């Protein structure tokens, strides 16, 4: 949608970053959010895998870990809406809580593996 608002033309394929300057403000925020989502995924995915491995070896993890695993993706959806909608306080709260969820998964997964 942001490309259509930036009057996308085929010649823009030669220099896609130059077209970015013509994006509307919400389009730029959507692009930044997209990049940030990759960064968040690289932190959360290993935590989720660690928790899964711990659960397979030691049995079910505490409810807190399960809640954190489900809460993080939900928070990312709210984060995306807040980022594109330019609502920084909600965006910051979602980011911090999502980071906490990943931390909980790392903590509970390591605790289960080391104690089990």
How should these model regions be labeled?
Residues 61-71:
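Structural signature of hydrophobic alpha-helical transmembrane segments
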Residues 47-60, 110:
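Juxtamembrane "helix exit" motif at the C-terminal ends of alpha-helical transmembrane segments
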Residues 1-31:
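Cytosolic, membrane-interface loops and tails of multi-pass inner-membrane proteins
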Residues 44, 48, 100, 104-107:
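Alpha-helical transmembrane segments
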Residues 105-116:
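Juxtamembrane boundary at the C-terminal end of a transmembrane helix
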Residues 35-51:
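Core segments of transmembrane alpha-helices
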Residues 77-100:
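Interfacial loop-to-transmembrane junctions
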Residues 72-76:
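Alpha-helical transmembrane segments of multi-pass membrane proteins
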């Amino acid at each position: 949608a942001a490309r259509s608002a930036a009057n996308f033309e085929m010649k823009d394929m030669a220099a896609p970053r130059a077209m970015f300057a013509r994006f509307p403000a919400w389009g730029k925020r959507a692009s930044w959010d997209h990049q940030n989502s990759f960064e968040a995924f690289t932190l959360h995915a290993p935590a989720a895998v660690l928790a899964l491995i711990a659960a397979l070896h030691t049995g079910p993890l505490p409810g807190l870990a399960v809640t954190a695993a489900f809460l993080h993706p939900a928070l990312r959806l709210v984060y995306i809406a807040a980022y594109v909608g330019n609502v920084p306080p909600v965006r910051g709260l979602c980011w911090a809580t999502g980071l906490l969820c990943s931390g909980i998964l790392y903590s509970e997964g390591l605790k289960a593996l080391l104690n089990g």
